[in-house]
Amino acid sequence: MSNVVTRRGGSSIRVRLTVLCAKNLAKRDFFRLPDPFAKIVVDGSGQCHSTDTVKNTLDPKWNQHYDLYVGKMDSITISIWNHKKIHKKQGAGFLGCVRLLSNAISRLKDTGYQRLDLCKLNPTDNDAVRGQIVVSLQTRDRIGTLGSVVDCRGLLDNEGALLEDTGPGRPLSCFMDEPAPYTDGPGAAGGGPGRLVESPGQEQRLQAQRVRGPEVREHVQTPQNRSHGFQSQDLPEGYEQRTTVQGQVYFLHTQTGVSTWHDPRIPRDLNSVNCDDLGSLPAGWEVRTTVSGRIYFVDHNNRTTQFTDPRLHHIINHQSQLKEPNHAIPVQSDGSLEDGDEFPAQRYERDLVQKLKVLRHELSLLQPQAGHCRVEVSREEIFEESYRQIMKMRPKDLKKRLMVKFRGEEGLDYGGVAREWLYLLCHEMLNPYYGLFQYSTDNIYTLQINPDSSINPDHLSYFHFVGRIMGLAVFHGHYINGGFTVPFYKQLLGKPIQLSDLESVDPELHKSLVWILENDITSVLDHTFCVEHNAFGRLLQHELKPNGKNLQVTEENKKEYVRLYVNWRFMRGIEAQFLALQKGFNELIPQHLLKPFEQKELELIIGGLDKIDISDWKANTRLKHCLANSNIVQWFWQAVESFDEERRARLLQFVTGSTRVPLQGFKALQGSTGAAGPRLFTIHLIDANTDNLPKAHTCFNRIDIPPYESYEKLYEKLLTAVEETSGFAVE
């Protein structure tokens, strides 16, 4: 979340206070739990905010943020109250508070989530106070900063104790005398990796289960001599492995400032492997569990702890060795592996669906908790109006919940209107008639960037817009109704283009270049490192390398010629356009989140499935007020089977708002925003006049069908509704 620090009157700075949750609040009533809410006051400034009330709990979760203007001498008081009692008398319902003095504010800024002990409002109060509150103070300065570890002891008023300090970009946790990372379940402090919170006094409650690795070494490295950050050779690009002063290993993505306990070299779903199947621990390692049951690992050699099982690295190393045919796995003379090279026999296959779940989770952490991205357009001018509205928004605004409205229509957007907007917009935006894109060849209808798009002086801004729309669709779980060439997706991933990528785009050119590589071209071809292409009826020349028109292609340099030709074929005149599109896409989808995917996988993530499997459709359809053997249901599927592919896609778009199917199939159709899970395609038999047309509820993926008397009438009414109607209304 990006926050711009502004000054008011030259003496105040803007900080964002996030009140995440509270834990272990005092229970004052024997028979019922409190309804806690938090109150935030900047003392003496008149600024006052209150969170939502959470019903019947001692562990409320708010995750709400507030922008505060804080002067150099201001303090912030955060108090928690029981909403059930605040109206009874003065001071009733008080559950605890914490006051941050000015020096505490300056030291706590940009240090991540901190857990603070709640205190009494006055030392003489009789009511007992207990529990903690988790908060963070953020400014723009945290991104990319390193800084030292913050020691916040003694900074809190009323002797309020800060649980643990942390440097910028560092996950929060706490070590006692025996290191024990601890988390109170997923999302306890922000819902994602790297937001871990430790409980005070954990040392006394920790019960570690110890399974020693063989030969624990006597010599250890002291924390004072340990490096606090380094770039491992096998870490993904942009990641650094770091160690806190307490000995915890974590990983920092230097470009975004996001930190995590999870080792990026280990696929997240690989952590579910049974520890018993992994063999013994390496020498000097020990496995322990926290009181919550989470397993962590202690490296006595370096005096560090981590959540990642060190044995999982053997699985990854083994897989990379299997992919490298020339790489020999060390084997002893008796055929067994050398010591320390154990790996499980089971193979690990990384599933696209699992990778997509990880991507969705990472993107959900980037979505602001408040506000909407509102788009209101007319169907007649959908392209230009969408362009103007999307381009004037900031990237962080585009990440808010998407709400689309068609001017003059009353439909409420719970997902279906947005899907229809994207469907109609893509039909205009990707149309070669506008000149931004063109078909790859005359008989292959995949899209590629038009090198002659510069005829429109604002074409780069439009490509930026296209990139934003693609990112918007992926970020909010929708699909783009259009297919690009495979090399386009490869470029979007930042991967180099190869000759084999040309086959699906231009088979004839691919065949010619392969022939050049496989045959002796001496005295056969008279080519130079200069190629010709047509632009607006003019024949232009392009040199593949300096002075290329005077450099003959020979048997010795033909590989270089083919490589340069392939690069030119895909990037001729489109470098600026592609960079503008990629910029817009990465404003919503950070590039590092795409690292695990291949080009075919990215194509499915952006475009979904364009082939409709009727058997899968039937198997994942819900029936309401009708049965599978009802005439209406049987006639409906009979009509679907009689449709061609285009009409089936149009029917799917009529009911769901999109012609595309999720890569998991119809079982993963998404419905209204915020639904607990997928919403299946639904056939609903309604009591209505049979002269009426079927109605669709795109937010619920539901089609309402009157009880038609015959198949012919159902077919006619269904076809009319699909092909002749448009617009949304509210019932």
From Swiss-Prot:
Cellular component GO terms held in the UniProt record: cytoplasm; plasma membrane
Gene name, Swiss-Prot/TrEMBL: smurf1
Listed EC numbers: 2.3.2.26
Residue ranges of every copy of the HECT domain listed in the record: 394-731
Span of domain C2: 1-120
Recorded domain comment: The C2 domain mediates membrane localization and substrate selection.
BP GO terms, sorted: BMP signaling pathway; cell differentiation; ectoderm development; negative regulation of BMP signaling pathway; proteasome-mediated ubiquitin-dependent protein catabolic process; protein modification process; protein polyubiquitination; ubiquitin-dependent protein catabolic process
Biased composition (Polar residues): 221-234
Biological or metabolic pathway of the protein: Protein modification; protein ubiquitination
Region span, Disordered: 210-235
Keywords assigned: Cell membrane, Cytoplasm, Differentiation, Membrane, Repeat, Transferase, Ubl conjugation pathway
Its biological purpose: E3 ubiquitin-protein ligase that acts as a negative regulator of BMP signaling pathway. Mediates ubiquitination and degradation of smad1 and smad5, 2 receptor-regulated SMADs specific for the BMP pathway. Promotes ubiquitination and subsequent proteasomal degradation of TRAF family members and rhoa. May play a role in dendrite formation by melanocytes.
Record-annotated WW domain positions: 233-266, 279-312
Protein's recorded name: E3 ubiquitin-protein ligase SMURF1
Pfam families recorded: C2, HECT, WW
Bilayer topology term: Peripheral membrane protein
PROSITE patterns linked: C2, HECT, WW_DOMAIN_1, WW_DOMAIN_2
SMART domains documented for this protein: C2, HECTc, WW
Chief location bin: cytoplasm
Catalytic activity: S-ubiquitinyl-[E2 ubiquitin-conjugating enzyme]-L-cysteine + [acceptor protein]-L-lysine = [E2 ubiquitin-conjugating enzyme]-L-cysteine + N(6)-ubiquitinyl-[acceptor protein]-L-lysine
Domain of life: Eukaryota
Molecular-function GO terms, alphabetical: SMAD binding; ubiquitin protein ligase activity; ubiquitin-protein transferase activity
Active site: C699 (glycyl thioester intermediate)
Compartment annotation: Cytoplasm; Cell membrane
